[in-house]
Amino acid sequence: MKPCILPWINFSTNTFGRPRVCGYSGVKTPTKLKDSDISTEWNSEYFKEIRKDFLNGEWPENCKRCKYVESLDGISKRMDENGFWYDQYKHLIDQTADDGSVPYEPPHIDVRTGMICNLKCIHCGTGASSKWQEDKALLDKYPNTENYQINNKWIEQEHGFWNHLRNTWHQTKRYNFLGGESFANKRHNEFLKDLSETEYAKDVNLAYVSNGTLITEDRLEQLSKFKSVVLRLSVDALERAGEYFRFPIKWDVYVEQLRLIDKFIKGKPNFDVGVQWTCSNVSMFYLVETYDIIRKEFPNIKFLFCNHVEWPIHMSAQNLPKEIKDVILNKINNYKFKDRDLDSFPFYVNHMMEKDLWKEHGKTLMQYLDDLDAARNISWNYSFQEMELHKYDPR
């Protein structure tokens, strides 16, 4: 097995500032960046052990998610990232010491910009969006609604971490920002503005996963100063279903936002923009319709199969009645996807069908939706009416 290149090039954090190799990491590290720094953590035992495991031809404990995807013949993050970066950076692997350490700073910085967010998506939760704190009745009731008492001032308000990044502008070639919502973070926005005005910007690659709601034409002009911009916009369902899923967006407003972006990037090869779809029980049902509208309405924006929900488990695509899974299979089998996607979507079908979690977690999903309705004055029965979930309510 070819090693994943990320442990040799990428330093990442979660929303609480814990170091990790990437967003799919399965091991929780004990240290937080507010108590340490990137240089120290880059050669921590966590990173060193992962490098050594890959060099020994073994899957690290940290990387179970990619191992699972590949076991179902899916395209894993390891495969994707190696496709982008392995040939460019494979020489760095040879610099690995016997203890797994490397003698250089990470060329890629992958930063979770805290929990500040303007949406509260139903497959997300309090650990990634501050807006969930509005739903007081749901706090501590579900796995994804834990009432965290986390001090994220180090990344959301204070300057120390961001100044550390400024000090390495001359050697960092790529920044990958995720939230929360990065464009809602004032310190991030200041950092981006400052970097865009330097001599280094033309040599820096940027990547974002964003909900897209805060991207303006001025912001796009600012981003255009960089060598390249990979922009991934989170979309899981359309119209009524999309408004419920990514509350409190308004679909018509969001469509205009996509039109603005689609128009701006036309003819600009340094922009790579795609909507990033995550497989869940709800988004799987609306996959074909969502794929179709992106395909037809936004010619410069790609549809990308990017992720699947494992947690909270009640939002997993495996947590659906068999009858609804059969409807989904029928819709997918009767739709002609683009040739470039024919190798991408089968994993999500295989994942959905691998397990039947409805008997164990169906009640939790239905109660969760009822609680969301009460907290947000919305209606799952209206928003997801095509699913006819009420027919299978096991309570």
PLM regions with names:
Residues 1-151, 168-169, 341-395:
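N-terminal pre-core extensions flanking Radical SAM catalytic domains
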Residues 59-65, 76, 104-105, 176, ...:
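Metal-dependent nucleotidyl/phosphoryl-transfer cores and adjacent nucleic-acid-binding surfaces
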Residues 162-167, 195-201, 221, 262-270, ...:
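Alpha-helix termini
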Residues 39-42, 64, 121, 166, ...:
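Non-transmembrane alpha-helical segments in soluble domains
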Residues 34-35, 42-48, 56-63, 106, ...:
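A structural signal for well-ordered alpha-helical scaffolds and beta->alpha junctions
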Residues 106-116, 125-157, 170-186, 198-217, ...:
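Core AdoMet radical
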Residues 187-193, 216-223, 286-290:
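Distinct, well-ordered alpha-helical segments
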Residues 15-16, 207, 226-232, 252-394:
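Conserved C-terminal portion of the radical SAM core fold
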